[in-house]
Structures are given as C-alpha cells and as structure tokens.
A protein has these predicted regions:
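Non-catalytic alpha-helical scaffolds and adjoining flexible linkers that form interface surfaces
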Residues: 2, 7-213
Length: 213
C-alpha cells in the first residue's frame, strides 16, 4: 500500500502551538482532511482533540512510549477499508495510557503490541500451547519439534510468551521485569512483527525506549 502524509499549515502563535499539541504522536483528533486523488500530501483543517491528552504530552515516559508505538503503527497500518474494531482498540489503549499513573507504564508497549496482533490477523495460536512445546514464529503456532527455519523460541521462551498472552492493561503492572528481560521480550516481539511487516528493524525510537524501560 501507499503512504499518506498530512500537512497542517499551523503557522505560528498560540493557535499553532495548540494544533501542534493535538498532532503529537498518538494524538486522537477529529479533523477535515483535504484528500485529492493523485496527491501524496493532503491538507488538514479544523483539528479537534476527542479527549484530553495532557498527561501524554507532559510525561516524558509516556511521550517516548507514544513516539515508539506511533512509529510501529505507521508501518503496520496502511490505507484500506475502515476497521472499527482496530480503531476502538487503539483509541481505548491511548485513553488507558493517558489515565495510567506514570510508574505503571513500563509494560504498556509490550501489552499493546501483543494485543494488537489480533486486529492485524497475526495473533499467535495460544490454544496450541503445551508444556515442552516451542513457538514457531512463522506459522504463529506451538509445536513439539523445531521447524526447518530459525525463527522460533526455546521451550522456556515459549512458555514465557504464553504467560504474556494473559497480560492486559489492567494487570500488566503486576508483571515484574528488569530492564534486560523487558528488552529481551520486546526484541522477540519485534522479531515476530518483522516476519510479517517490513521495516521493523530500523525504528528510530526503539533505542530511546530501551534506555527508559
């Protein structure tokens, strides 16, 4: 699919500052888009925030999280048919991040990406899990024998992935990881996404996120 760029002629002054704040990473807005056939850059008018996002703007940890997830969404979401379920999930997740205490956001990106898989059609077959099985990242299923390719998790990693399938925005703060383990989990998730979407290895915000969490 092709990418669509939105240009906002905000100008300068107080109104420009307000508009730029609305259009921050993961900003949820209602607007009028001037979409014209044959153009790759489209105009944007009358942006209006659908709910307050002051915490997302003001908290550096949440802001870094938002920048990373916005970059991921820019790669996996392409022009196509409207998907109300996906929209409601993303909006609900952003609202949850906005309302969440800052000290509880460390696992948000892990939870978001795992649950996003369902709406992208790449959700692992969690029902196929069994003790001693390994997770085949290409077929998105658990199996007893190693596949011919190298994209699979060890039995211990596979068990850990299954345990993560129970994570949601309400209980994710109960999953206690140190920075090294959290980065290993994120690396595995990004490897999984990379098998289904190109460009995941070059995310600019990934290293920044790893330094914070």
């Amino acid at each position: 699919g092709s990418e669509m760029c939105i240009r906002d002629r905000a100008g300068s002054g107080r109104e420009a500052t307000r508009r730029r704040a609305l259009l921050m990473p993961l900003g949820v807005v209602e607007c009028v888009a001037d979409v014209r056939p044959g153009r790759s850059i489209h105009g944007l008018r009358e942006p209006r925030g659908l709910f307050a996002q002051s915490s997302l703007r003001g908290n550096p940890l949440k802001n870094a999280m938002a920048s990373f997830l916005a970059e991921v969404l820019g790669l996996v979401l392409r022009e196509g048919q409207a998907d109300e379920g996906l929209w409601l999930y993303v909006r609900g997740a952003i609202e949850a991040l906005e309302a969440m205490p800052g000290m509880r956001v460390a696992n948000f990106h892990i939870c978001f990406l795992l649950r996003l898989c369902r709406f992208l059609g790449i959700e692992p077959d969690w029902d196929s899990w069994g003790d001693g099985k390994i997770f085949d990242m290409v077929d998105a299923t658990y199996r007893y024998s190693a596949p011919l390719h190298r994209h699979y998790l060890t039995p211990d990693e596979s068990r850990g992935a299954y345990m993560l399938s129970r994570m949601n925005f309400g209980n994710m703060h109960k999953y206690k990881f140190n920075r090294r383990v959290r980065r290993e989990i994120l690396d595995a998730i990004m490897r999984y996404y990379s098998l289904h979407y190109a460009g995941m290895s070059g995310l600019k915000s990934l290293d920044v996120l790893a330094e914070l969490f």
